Amino acid sequence: MHDYIKERTIKIGKYIVETKKTVRVIAKEFGVSKSTVHKDLTERLPEINPDLANEVKEILDYHKSIRHLRGGEATKLKYKKDEILEGEPVQQS
């Protein structure tokens, strides 16, 4: 494994522990894909720093456990935003 990959993996691991941000947000901030962030955190980090990997795993598991709630909230906000922009209520079923 190249040194820059190890460094990035550790940086991302520490960053997610400090901020509790999602993989999607971190990927955007680090300029890499979600797949890369996920692979760094779930496959590479345990080899490099098992203790940090355990902390990260807890955060990822938490995010996974609430993703169905986040998705619903995002949809709700989207329709609310559309309603405000159009000036009339969006029909909901």
Swiss-Prot record:
Span of domain HTH deoR-type: 4-75
PROSITE patterns, per database record: HTH_DEOR_1
Annotation: DNA-binding region: 21-40
Gene Ontology MF, one: DNA binding
Keyword set, alphabetical order: DNA-binding, Repressor, Sporulation, Transcription, Transcription regulation
One family name in Pfam for this protein: SpoIIID
Entries under InterPro entries matching the protein: Spore_III_D (IPR014208), Tscrpt_reg_HTH_DeoR_CS (IPR018356)
Regions annotated as coiled coil: none
Gene Ontology BP term (one): sporulation resulting in formation of a cellular spore
Function text: This protein regulates the transcription of sigK, which encodes mother cell chamber RNA polymerase sigma-factor (sigma K).
Descriptive protein name: Stage III sporulation protein D
UniProt organism field: Bacillus subtilis (strain 168)
